[in-house]
């Protein structure tokens, strides 16, 4: 499953609050990777509506959605999640 991390409706945090949320967000993504729930995560290099992606390696979209929505950035409303079923073409994987 691929999760698009998009700008959320609540982006009016102070710089201190936003920096704190960013640290918690990165810790959350690190845990998802360490626990084997996510294969890769990362931001986009522009300031567009879609801020980044996470590719979840879990059996159901419900699990992917639950994991994505416990991200502190999502819980705060700074980001919102859009999840889709996704798979690599046969024979292609992450390197």
Regions found by a protein language model. Name each.
Residues 1-95:
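Conserved, structured core segments of small domains
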């Amino acid at each position: 499953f691929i999760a698009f991390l998009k700008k959320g409706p609540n982006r009016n945090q102070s710089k201190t609050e936003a920096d704190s949320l960013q640290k918690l967000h990165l810790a959350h993504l690190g845990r998802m990777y360490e626990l084997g729930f996510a294969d890769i995560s990362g931001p986009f290099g522009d300031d567009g509506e879609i801020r980044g992606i996470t590719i979840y390696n879990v059996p159901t979209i419900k699990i992917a959605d639950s994991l994505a929505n416990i991200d502190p950035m999502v819980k705060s409303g700074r980001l919102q999640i859009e999840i889709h079923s996704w798979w690599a073409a046969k024979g292609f994987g992450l390197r």
